[in-house]
């Protein structure tokens, strides 16, 4: 049994999703968003760090997965996103959690079956996979998608008999 915390970082809204994995089955434990105030960036980064730290204390995950930074057209946005990721990753490493990262394409492929899926498709498939009564909010659905992607990737590595190592899917430790 393992508990996975997935995070979809953002400087304004950071989504999180927590699933429990037993064998090949995934169970929804919780999800939501860390909404930062419209203060200066350093304060927003602290809110992300504190929020992720609290979620870790609450759910006691065994593993942490986060979406990789994509190259945005706006360099300032990409830098802020990278800093938000950093705040979340530091919270995970402070709790001695292994950290894995996945691209948006990997996440969409794992959840929907195509790397070019729309947000609404990710929301729908997360709802179906986790048997939720309603589709989660977009940022929370993306974070749950990160956790689901990590679970599927981990299962694939186990099926390979350990031939692939953790670096294959961007794990830090």
UniProtKB/Swiss-Prot annotation:
Lineage top rank: taxon: Bacteria
The top EC class, named as a word, is: hydrolase
Which residues does the Swiss-Prot or TrEMBL record annotate as the active site? 8, 67, 139
Where does the UniProt annotation locate this protein? Cytoplasm
* Family from the record: Belongs to the RuvC family.
Entry keywords, A to Z: Cytoplasm, DNA damage, DNA recombination, DNA repair, DNA-binding, Endonuclease, Hydrolase, Magnesium, Metal-binding, Nuclease
Share what the entry says about its subunit structure, partners included.
Answer: Homodimer which binds Holliday junction (HJ) DNA. The HJ becomes 2-fold symmetrical on binding to RuvC with unstacked arms; it has a different conformation from HJ DNA in complex with RuvA. In the full resolvosome a probable DNA-RuvA(4)-RuvB(12)-RuvC(2) complex forms which resolves the HJ.
Keyword hit for Transport = no
GO MF terms held by the record? crossover junction DNA endonuclease activity; DNA binding; magnesium ion binding
Residues engaged in binding Mg(2+) 1: 8, 139
Task: Please state the protein's primary subcellular location.
Answer: cytoplasm
Q: Which co-factor is required? A: Mg(2+)
Q: Where does Mg(2+) 2 bind?
A: 67
What does the record note about the cofactor? Binds 2 Mg(2+) ion per subunit.
GO cellular component: a single term: cytoplasm
Q: What is this protein called?
A: Crossover junction endodeoxyribonuclease RuvC
What is the recorded function of this protein according to its Swiss-Prot or TrEMBL entry? The RuvA-RuvB-RuvC complex processes Holliday junction (HJ) DNA during genetic recombination and DNA repair. Endonuclease that resolves HJ intermediates. Cleaves cruciform DNA by making single-stranded nicks across the HJ at symmetrical positions within the homologous arms, yielding a 5'-phosphate and a 3'-hydroxyl group; requires a central core of homology in the junction. The consensus cleavage sequence is 5'-(A/T)TT(C/G)-3'. Cleavage occurs on the 3'-side of the TT dinucleotide at the point of strand exchange.
Gene Ontology biological process terms from the UniProt entry: DNA recombination; DNA repair
Task: Enumerate the catalysed reactions.
Answer: Endonucleolytic cleavage at a junction such as a reciprocal single-stranded crossover between two homologous DNA duplexes (Holliday junction)
The EC number(s) given in the record are 3.1.21.10
InterPro entries in the cross-refs: RNaseH-like_sf (IPR012337), RNaseH_sf (IPR036397), X-over_junc_endoDNase_Mg_BS (IPR020563), X-over_junc_endoDNase_RuvC (IPR002176)
């Amino acid at each position: 049994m393992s508990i996975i915390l997935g995070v979809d970082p953002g400087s304004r809204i950071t989504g999180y999703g927590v699933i429990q994995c037993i064998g090949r089955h995934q169970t929804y434990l919780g999800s939501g968003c860390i909404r930062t105030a419209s203060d200066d960036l350093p304060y927003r980064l602290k809110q992300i760090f504190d929020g992720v730290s609290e979620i870790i204390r609450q759910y006691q995950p065994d593993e942490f997965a986060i979406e990789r930074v994509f190259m945005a057209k706006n360099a300032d946005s990409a830098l802020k996103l990278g800093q938000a990721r950093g705040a979340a990753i530091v919270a995970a490493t402070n709790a001695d959690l292994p950290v894995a990262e996945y691209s948006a394409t990997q996440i969409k492929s794992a959840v929907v079956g195509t790397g070019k899926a729309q947000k609404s498709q990710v929301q729908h498939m997360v709802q179906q996979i986790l048997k939720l009564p309603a589709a989660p909010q977009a940022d929370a659905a993306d974070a749950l998608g990160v956790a689901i992607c990590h679970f599927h990737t981990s299962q694939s590595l186990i099926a390979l008999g350990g031939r692939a190592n953790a670096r294959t899917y961007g794990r830090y430790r």
